[in-house]
């Protein structure tokens, strides 16, 4: 009984303390794409003209489009699920990881809010959905992971990325 009271007390403190939080792991995320875009307002005002990395949105910097998978443990074996696309990009002098991350996130926010036009087959924006964009450094350059939780949206992201950069190499098989 004592243990139950301790757990219920801890749970009530955690839930009451996070009533105003925008994210709590035990509750579903109810934010809309517009809500998420507005969360970036302060960050994106500094780069309103997109001058930090003007070539970041060019299809020519994308060397390959690789389908991004996640391993989900289910039962004995597990399962691979499509999450989106990994866009491998050429390194350029004016495009470090942080600048590229902010440029792509602000582009998604601006298009979502109607402040910027959507590029043809834009892999960084999907109407009605918010894409998780994470830029990292690799041995060969930069990689922008454009991810979503919906399998249908993930498939659309891969298709749009391939059409956006048709000269880029397409890799669909999961990597070990």
List PLM regions with ranges.
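Bacterial Sec signal peptide processing site at the extreme N-terminus
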Residues: 15-36
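Sec-dependent bacterial lipoprotein signal peptides
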Residues: 1-18
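Short, solvent-exposed interaction modules
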Residues: 117-149
